């Protein structure tokens, strides 16, 4: 009897040790997965694509706050995607079009300023997706030849694919319709179709993790308020263009529906919809609460109040000036957010209160 009890004790001890070893091995494996980000988009997340792609000079004062030089980013410093990289303890994303000193080991950025979901300009979403397919295929070829500084097949499979696009489509449609709601809304399904095809293509090539930003409150941009004649009835309670924000909300509603549809279609994929609109609108509405000033004024521009924006002297052009304290400004150049505002947005995103389904960046690896 004593021998039997001792054997059972030994058996359970060995079993527990085995489970512990397996558990530790699994934990170690998960912790060793390094985050990889692959981004598609426009100027909201362009880290130098337009500079490399078309040679458009974007120098100081752009970049003055953090990089202290022009990097191709349209802003005074870091973008949302840069703060994501910092949070994940990885280097900033190199533009796909950068031919001089790119680092593609932990990701790549296909975003180009001015890009649209529809095939309107040089680097629309469909072209960015084609570039991705070529990049993936070429990376595999080079790795098979001995290269070790690129994303391997497992890396592409475990990468997070981020999409932030659509604002330029909506603005162009608004301009074409003389700021009329109905004609713009009629074009939204075609915009969403391009995003759908993009996600489907990435999925076809092995992508299983998606992070999709909706579009922000376009009607709160100082540029829009400055270039379009309007009266008080055109504005909402915080002074933003109603029609701009209404079309943005219509687009976002359709984008959320699309994400839900694709989530049902791709059972083995994770697709997170991030409500950037709500974060940015809250910042503009409650700016004093968060230590900001003048939400409807460009920090870098010309003309003074109410919007400090003039097409003849935009940020960086002769005559333009920079506000006294950029850390308290929300909008940098009339369109793009300041580094301080981008940090606010990322801090809000990382609470998981604005993502559907609720998911954090850290949980993807």
From Swiss-Prot:
MF terms (GO), sorted A to Z: hydrolase activity, acting on ester bonds
EC number, UniProt record: 3.1.1.-
Positions glycosylated per UniProt: 137, 178, 231
Keyword Cytoplasm listed: no
Keyword vocabulary terms for this entry: Glycoprotein, Hydrolase, Lipid degradation, Lipid metabolism, Secreted, Signal
Group of enzyme by EC: hydrolase
Active site location: 43 (nucleophile), 333, 336
Main subcellular localisation: secreted
InterPro entries: GDSL (IPR001087), SGNH_hydro_sf (IPR036514), SGNH_plant_lipase-like (IPR035669)
Example of a GO cellular component annotation carried by this entry: extracellular region
Source taxon at top rank: Eukaryota
Biological process terms in GO annotation: lipid catabolic process
Signal peptide interval: 1-25
Record has Nucleus as a keyword: no
Localization per Swiss-Prot or TrEMBL: Secreted
UniProt family annotation: Belongs to the 'GDSL' lipolytic enzyme family.
Name of the protein in its database record: GDSL esterase/lipase At3g62280
Organism: Arabidopsis thaliana
Classification lineage: Eukaryota, Viridiplantae, Streptophyta, Embryophyta, Tracheophyta
């Amino acid at each position: 009897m004593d021998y039997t009890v001792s054997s059972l004790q030994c058996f359970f001890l060995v079993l527990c040790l085995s489970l512990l070893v397996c558990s530790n091995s699994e934990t170690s494996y998960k912790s060793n997965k390094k985050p990889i980000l692959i981004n598609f988009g426009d100027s909201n997340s362009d880290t130098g694509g337009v500079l490399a792609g078309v040679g458009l000079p974007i120098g100081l004062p752009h970049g003055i706050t953090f990089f202290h030089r022009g990097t191709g980013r349209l802003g005074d410093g870091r973008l949302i995607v840069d703060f994501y990289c910092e949070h994940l303890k990885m280097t900033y994303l190199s533009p796909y079009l950068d031919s001089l000193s790119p680092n593609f080991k932990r990701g790549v950025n296909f975003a180009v300023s001015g890009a649209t979901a529809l095939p309107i300009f040089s680097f629309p979403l469909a072209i960015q997706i084609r570039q991705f397919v070529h990049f993936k295929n070429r990376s595999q070829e080079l790795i098979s030849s001995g290269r070790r500084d690129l994303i391997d097949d497992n890396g592409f499979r475990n990468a997070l694919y981020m999409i932030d696009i659509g604002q330029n489509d909506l603005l162009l449609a608004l301009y074409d319709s003389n700021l009329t709601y109905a004609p713009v809304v009629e074009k939204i399904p075609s915009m969403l179709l391009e995003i759908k095809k993009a996600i489907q293509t990435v999925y076809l090539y092995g992508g299983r993790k998606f992070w999709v930003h909706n579009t922000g409150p376009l009607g709160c941009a100082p540029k829009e308020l400055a270039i379009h004649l309007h009266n008080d009835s055109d504005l909402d309670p915080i002074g933003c263009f109603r029609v701009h924000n209404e079309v943005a909300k219509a687009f976002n509603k359709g984008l959320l529906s699309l994400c839900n549809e694709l989530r049902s279609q791709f059972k083995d994929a994770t697709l997170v919809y991030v409500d950037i609109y709500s974060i940015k609108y809250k910042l503009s509405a409650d700016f004093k609460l968060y230590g900001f000033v003048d939400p409807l004024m460009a920090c870098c521009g010309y003309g003074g109040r109410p919007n400090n924006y003039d097409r003849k002297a935009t940020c960086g052009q002769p005559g333009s000036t920079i506000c006294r304290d950029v850390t308290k400004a929300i909008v940098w150049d009339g369109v793009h957010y300041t580094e301080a505002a981008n940090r606010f947005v990322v801090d809000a995103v990382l609470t998981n209160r604005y993502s559907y389904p609720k998911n954090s960046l850290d949980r993807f690896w």
